[in-house]
A protein has these predicted regions:
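Surface-exposed, interaction-prone regions used to assemble/regulate multi-protein complexes
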Residues: 1-147
Length: 147
């Protein structure tokens, strides 16, 4: 299923709490439904030998904090990452039972490690953003389709 990512364009890197969200879309389709990758395990986004963003960069707000985002190091890092990656196309997507690696056409690598999580903890979820497509869910050493 992840082969559908080949030549898709990365259009957004965002987050929800401590979950990374990557959105992929066709570069030349007008009304295409995007694919979403939710990452809940260890990950790193690399450019050569430099880590651009990783799971340790996430900041979870405490109750009572304002979510203005502007001027916050986390928000600035995410905005900078979007500037660098927005519009890059997937050159390759490789998955095995312990990790997922997505290589972009600008040389940036997105590496997701599934081997660190507990056996039944969801590590990542890949799906088309519609109401009918199944979700591919990765757990430690196994995959599952959810309809």
């Amino acid at each position: 299923m992840l082969s559908v990512l080949n030549r898709k364009m990365l259009t957004l890197v965002s987050h929800c709490a401590d979950m990374l969200e990557l959105c992929f879309d066709d570069a030349d389709a007008v009304n295409d439904t995007p694919y979403i990758l939710h990452v809940q395990s260890s990950f790193a986004i690399w450019d050569e030998q430099t880590v651009l963003f990783e799971n340790r960069d996430f900041y979870t707000m405490q109750s009572g904090e304002n979510d203005s985002g502007a001027g916050q190091p986390f928000a600035e890092k995410l905005a900078s990452l979007n500037q660098k990656l927005n519009g890059c196309c997937v050159a390759k997507a490789v998955v095995d039972r312990d990790w997922l690696c997505i290589g972009l056409d600008n040389g940036v690598q997105i590496e997701i490690d599934t081997d660190e999580e507990e056996k039944n903890d969801e590590t990542w979820r890949f799906f088309k953003l519609d109401d009918t497509s199944p979700h591919l869910i990765a757990y430690r050493h196994r995959f599952e389709w959810i309809h």
